[in-house]
Structure formats: structure tokens, C-alpha cells
């Protein structure tokens, strides 16, 4: 509906310019005035025409205003200096908007574009930790937004089964007493992490172990010990997938790094790069990128001839280039150089350079799970802590059966983590503060509470969805602001998808929840003269909040 009123405004200006014999510019720009008293939309078309017509913008606006016709969706069109301001007829517009809001509100028609979005892709050498969580949340939320915007999206997890870390774990299984089941931990990824830590300690004591690990890597590339390597990786991934499922993070496909060595793709990549004329060789084969503005070369092989992560990454991106129209990677800001190097190499071989979303890191304040004898904080621990803190808040507020309180706490705890991370642009560093994350006055809990409050009000009113919108209903104040916000939701989805950003959806959800809570306190619904219209408005807010939270991977509870 917001795009509809934009179209009506542009069409009215176009018709006016044609009447005046003025050539219509390629784009008639519209903006939302900062003050609603200045209208719902404003056009700066007179500024755009001033140079070509050699006239003052205010004179051009006066001419346009003398012939412009007001579309029925607008109450009036006024000039404010050189601006042309459009005021929506909220009596007419609000009814149309509420009639249009269905369960899938915010969804866009399918686009003929396939997106391959890789995210998380943590090495399977232990549990996911706080350093991985922002990647997973940005990637999963963006995939949801892109799908709602009409894109065909496949999310991928790139499994590093050929890295040194996995070879170290395999060395541990071959040389230390016991199997993975013998290590402490409730989940397999934690047991793998314990073994990896132990091997690291042995390596510090005996650096000669490194040669044995290198030999394992060579043998694995040649096809030996495949079963053991796969066992280690699958064990660890099973635990990591449990964590991601609890956090509502989903991957459509797991792509194993080793496949590109096994099927000869890496060899073909190396041979193709040699033919570009940009490679050099000393102890290792490398790609000279100085001509592309990078002083640091990209090393393609080890001195013993085995492939490196970078080479296999190029092979993987070439596969993604064949499978998708748009390639998106989510990476930490410390990967900027490597991503630039791989992007150049992929383009040299005719592939698509990926769009990369870089993010800064997340930390916990000192004393808040941040230092546990120097060991990283796992995502499992973070979620357990969030659940525990949320359960405490829930029990303070209501006397509920344990199982109900537990479910609500899980919803609030996971929502707190996902929302707190999604709400900021990826370029900003995050310090995770529990009091802010779990606040019922701000943050995700307040949004979930607004949804639950809407559900309760509709239940109390025995709402059916068939209620009539009364004649004469013309929203004002918070009611009107709710209508304005509801109309914008599809635009927020579209713009977030195009910008490849998640935080505008998070901010929108907070704005909608805040406005609804204000409306709830100030505006009577049940028993009012406009009960039908207001119940329909509340139901539209419920649907939109639910859909916005779903885009962020957050459950919208019906009770809190």
C-alpha cells in the first residue's frame, strides 16, 4: 500500500507536468517529511527541474499546483515553499490497508534471481562460540528477509574437513588413549573441542607432532583415513547443528571442502590460474595481485604441493557462481584481505565475485561469562545463561506452571540473543549486556510482549476476523501512526533485502511494538464506537509483529 500511494503521487505530478508541457524527468523523487504535519509524502521535483527550466523551484511548484489533480487516496495536496506535499486520506487508506493485510503480509512476488548465501561455516573442531554467533544470526536472518522479498535462496555451510584443526583431532584419536565418547561433555562438539584442546597442549610440549599432522593432511588429500576424518567432522557437526537448531538457525546444504580435491576441481583451478599469467613460484605457488592493487600475494599451495584453504575456497566459489545469480558471503572483518584475494581469483576464472557482508565482533563485559580461565564461551553456554535469566524474570512477573514458564523463558532468552545482535549494523562492535538484552521495556522482550498483548486483547474480544470496519473511522494520534508503520512493512522488507542488511527490520519491529504499546494504553478498543476497526488494527499489528520477528528468527509468543 505504501508503494501504491507513492505511485499515485508520482502519477499526479506526471499528469500535471504533461499538462504544462514540461518534460517529465526520468525519476520523480519522493521522501517522507520528518514532521507528519508536513504531509505523508513530499516531492522535490521542482528542484530537479529548476536547472533545465532556468526558473526558481518555488515558481515551478506554483505552476504544478495550479493544474495538479488530487487522487482519491489523498485528502489534499499542498505546497510548502518549493515542496509538493501529499496528505493521505486516512479514513479511506486505513480501511484499504487493513483489508489487504493477510497472514503473509510483507511477502513480495517471486523474483527470477537465485541467491547462494553462505554463513556460519565454523571449523568443526569444537562447539560454536560467541565469535561465531553474529555470523549465524546475520546470515540466517538475511536469508529469511531475502525469501520474503521474493528471492530464491539457498543457504550453505562450508564444511572445512581438510584443515589442520581436523587433522590435529585425527592425530589425537590415533595417538592418544580413548575415543571421542570417552571425553567429557553432553554434546559431541564439546567432546571434540576437549580433544582438540588436549592435542594443542601436546603440540606446545612437542612441536615435532606438527610434522605428523602435516603427513596426515597429505594422506587425506590422497584419499587415506577418509573414514576417520569424516567421523570426526560428522560428530562435531551433529553437536553444532543441535546448537543452531535451538537458535533457530537453518542451513539448506552442507558443502564439504574435501569434495573439491577429490573430484579434481582444485587441480583444474590451479592449472587455470597458471594460464592467467598472474602466478609466480618460489617454494610455493602464488597469485601475484599487485596489478589489482593488492601488495600481498595469494598463496595457492604449500611447499609440499598440497592445496591450501584459499585454493579450495576459489573452487567452492566457482561452484556457487554456476549455481546462483547472486553470491553472498558473511565474514568477520578480519577476513577482508582474504575475501578480496579470493574475489579477484574467482573473477579471473570467469566466476562471480561474491557480495561480502563483513561484521565486527561481539564481546561480553568483564565478569559476565567473559573470562572462564581463558576458555571461550560457547553458544550453548550463552543460551543456557539467557534461558536462566529469562526464567527468573518470567517467574517474578507471573505464577505459571514450570513447563509453561520454561517454554516462555526459552523463547525470550533466544529472542534476546538474536535481537540484540541483529539490531545493530554489522559494522558496529557489540558488547553484549544482559540487562539491555532481556529488558521488558526495550529490546526483544518488549516486542514479544506487544505481540502477546495483542493476542490476549483479541482473545478477550472473541475476535473472528470478520468484524466490519465502521464508517467514519479516521485514525488519529497513535492509531494513525500504527497505520503509517503497518503500511511501511513491505517497503522495509524490500529495502532491507536490497541493502543486504538485517538491522532495519529489527528497528522496525521495535518501533511498531512501541507504538502499539502506546496505543494500547491510550486508545479504548473493546466497547468503543470503532471496536471493529480497532480490533482489525490490533490483528494487523499482531500479524506484522509476528512476521517481523520471524524474519529475525524469533518466536512470537501468544502469552507471556
Swiss-Prot record:
| Single GO BP term | arginyl-tRNA aminoacylation
* Annotated compartments: Cytoplasm
Q: Catalysed reaction(s)?
A: tRNA(Arg) + L-arginine + ATP = L-arginyl-tRNA(Arg) + AMP + diphosphate
Query: Which Gene Ontology CC terms are recorded?
Result: cytoplasm
Q: Which Gene3D superfamilies match?
A: Arginyl tRNA synthetase N-terminal domain, HUPs, Isoleucyl-tRNA Synthetase, Domain 1
Taxonomic source organism: Methanothermobacter thermautotrophicus (strain ATCC 29096 / DSM 1053 / JCM 10044 / NBRC 100330 / Delta H) (Methanobacterium thermoautotrophicum)
Q: Which UniProt keywords apply?
A: Aminoacyl-tRNA synthetase, ATP-binding, Cytoplasm, Ligase, Nucleotide-binding, Protein biosynthesis
Q: Which family does it belong to?
A: Belongs to the class-I aminoacyl-tRNA synthetase family.
Q: Does the keyword DNA-binding apply?
A: no
* Molecular-function GO terms, alphabetical: arginine-tRNA ligase activity; ATP binding
Protein name, entry field? Arginine--tRNA ligase
Its domain of life? Archaea
| Pfam families hit by this protein | Arg_tRNA_synt_N (PF03485), DALR_1 (PF05746), tRNA-synt_1d (PF00750)
SMART domains from the UniProt entry? Arg_tRNA_synt_N, DALR_1
Q: Which InterPro entries match?
A: aa-tRNA-synth_I_CS, Arg-tRNA-ligase, Arg-tRNA-synth_N, Arg-tRNA-synth_N_sf, ArgRS_core, DALR_anticod-bd, Rossmann-like_a/b/a_fold, tRNAsynth_Ia_anticodon-bd
Q: What class of enzyme is it?
A: ligase
Per the UniProt entry, the Enzyme Commission number(s) are: 6.1.1.19
- At which positions is motif 'HIGH' region? 122-132
Amino acid at each position: 500500500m505504501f508503494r501504491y500511494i507513492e505511485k499515485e503521487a508520482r502519477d499526479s505530478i506526471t499528469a500535471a507536468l504533461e499538462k504544462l508541457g514540461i518534460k517529465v524527468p526520468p525519476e520523480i523523487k519522493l521522501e517522507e517529511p520528518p514532521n507528519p504535519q508536513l504531509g505523508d509524502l513530499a516531492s522535490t521535483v521542482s528542484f530537479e527541474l529548476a536547472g533545465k527550466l532556468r526558473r526558481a523551484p518555488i515558481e515551478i511548484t506554483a505552476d504544478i499546483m495550479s493544474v495538479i489533480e488530487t487522487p482519491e487516496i489523498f485528502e489534499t495536496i499542498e505546497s510548502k515553499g518549493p515542496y509538493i506535499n501529499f496528505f493521505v486520506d486516512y479514513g479511506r487508506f486505513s480501511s484499504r490497508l487493513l483489508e489487504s493485510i493477510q497472514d503473509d503480509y510483507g511477502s513480495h512476488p517471486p523474483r527470477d534471481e537465485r541467491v547462494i548465501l553462505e554463513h556460519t561455516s565454523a571449523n568443526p573442531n569444537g562447539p560454536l562460540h560467541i565469535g561465531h554467533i553474529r555470523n549465524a544470526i546475520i546470515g540466517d536472518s538475511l536469508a529469511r528477509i531475502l525469501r520474503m522479498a521474493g528471492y530464491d535462496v539457498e543457504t550453505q555451510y562450508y564444511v572445512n574437513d581438510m584443515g589442520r584443526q581436523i587433522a590435529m583431532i585425527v592425530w589425537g584419536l590415533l595417538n592418544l588413549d580413548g575415543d571421542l565418547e570417552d571425553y567429557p561433555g553432553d554434546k559431541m562438539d564439546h567432546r571434540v573441542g576437549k580433544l582438540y584442546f588436549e592435542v594443542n597442549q601436546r603440540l606446545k610440549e612437542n612441536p615435532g607432532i606438527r610434522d605428523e599432522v602435516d603427513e596426515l593432511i597429505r594422506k587425506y588429500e590422497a584419499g587415506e583415513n577418509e573414514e576417520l576424518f569424516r567421523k570426526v567432522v560428522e560428530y562435531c557437526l551433529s553437536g553444532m547443528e543441535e546448537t543452531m537448531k535451538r537458535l533457530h538457525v537453518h542451513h539448506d546444504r552442507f558443502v564439504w571442502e574435501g569434495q573439491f580435491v577429490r573430484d579434481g576441481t582444485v587441480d583444474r583451478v590451479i592449472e587455470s590460474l597458471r594460464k592467467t599469467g598472474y602466478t609466480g613460484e618460489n617454494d610455493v605457488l602464488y597469485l601475484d595481485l599487485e596489478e589489482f592493487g593488492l601488495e600481498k600475494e595469494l598463496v595457492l599451495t604449500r611447499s609440499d604441493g598440497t592445496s591450501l584453504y584459499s585454493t579450495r575456497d576459489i573452487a567452492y566459489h566457482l561452484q556457487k557462481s554456476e549455481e546462483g545469480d547472486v553470491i553472498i558471503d558473511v565474514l568477520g572483518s578480519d577476513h577482508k584481505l582474504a575475501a578480496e584475494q579470493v574475489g579477484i581469483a574467482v573473477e579471473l576464472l570467469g566466476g562471480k565475485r561474491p557480495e561480502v557482508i563483513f561484521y565486527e565482533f561481539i564481546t561480553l563485559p568483564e565478569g559476565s561469562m567473559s573470562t572462564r580461565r581463558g576458555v571461550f564461551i560457547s553458544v550453548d553456554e550463552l543460551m543456557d545463561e539467557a534461558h536462566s535469566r529469562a526464567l527468573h524474570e518470567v517467574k517474578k512477573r507471573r505464577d505459571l506452571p514450570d513447563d509453561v514458564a520454561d517454554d516462555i523463558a526459552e523463547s525470550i532468552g533466544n529472542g534476546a540473543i538474536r535481537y540484540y545482535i541483529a539490531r545493530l549494523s554489522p559494522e558496529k562492535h557489540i558488547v553484549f549486556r544482559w540487562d539491555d538484552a532481556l529488558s521488558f521495556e526495550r529490546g526483544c522482550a518488549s516486542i514479544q510482549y506487544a505481540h502477546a498483548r495483542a493476542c490476549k486483547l483479541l482473545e478477550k474480544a472473541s475476535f473472528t476476523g470478520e468484524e466490519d470496519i465502521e464508517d467514519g473511522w479516521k485514525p488519529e494520534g497513535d492509531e494513525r501512526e500504527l497505520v503509517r508503520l503497518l503500511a511501511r512493512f513491505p517497503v522495509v522488507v524490500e529495502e532491507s533485502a536490497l541493502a543486504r542488511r538485517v538491522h532495519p527490520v529489527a528497528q522496525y519491529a521495535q518501533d511498531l511494538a512501541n507504538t502499539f504499546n502506546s496505543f494500547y494504553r491510550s486508545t479504548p478498543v473493546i466497547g468503543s464506537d470503532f471496536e471493529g476497526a480497532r480490533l482489525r488494527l490490533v490483528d494487523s499489528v499482531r500479524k506484522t509483529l509476528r512476521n517481523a520477528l520471524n524474519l529475525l528468527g524469533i518466536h512470537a509468543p501468544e502469552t507471556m
